[in-house]
């Protein structure tokens, strides 16, 4: 599934985000939007240049040996069914690799 295009210019500066960062142990029950999920995937491993060699996270020798997976629970992300997803940075898309709410199995 192709993800929505990421935002390059956020609503808050990096400095403000760092200054206002707090640990929260009480979470909202509101599901993430597909746009929010897309932004998280891109920030973790997204392509940051047109040639496709550079990503949002550094990697020695540009090897990028780590893949990004997300386990999505029932009604946790609008537009995604529950299951495990693999993120493909080259196409900025996710693919379902296992169906069902797997949170208890991976927690």
List each model region and its residues.
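N-terminal amphipathic, basic helical "cap/leader" segment at the start of enzyme domains
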Residues: 1-107
């Amino acid at each position: 599934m192709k993800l929505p295009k990421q935002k390059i210019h956020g609503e808050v500066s990096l400095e403000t985000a760092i200054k206002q960062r707090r640990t929260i142990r009480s979470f909202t029950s509101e599901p993430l939007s597909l746009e929010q999920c897309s932004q998280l995937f891109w920030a973790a491993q997204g392509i940051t240049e047109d040639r496709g060699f550079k990503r949002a996270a550094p990697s020695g020798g540009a090897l990028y040996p780590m893949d990004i997976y997300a386990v999505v629970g029932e009604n946790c992300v609008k537009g995604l069914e529950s299951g495990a997803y693999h993120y493909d940075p080259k196409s900025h898309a996710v693919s379902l690799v296992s169906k069902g709410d797997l949170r208890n199995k991976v927690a």
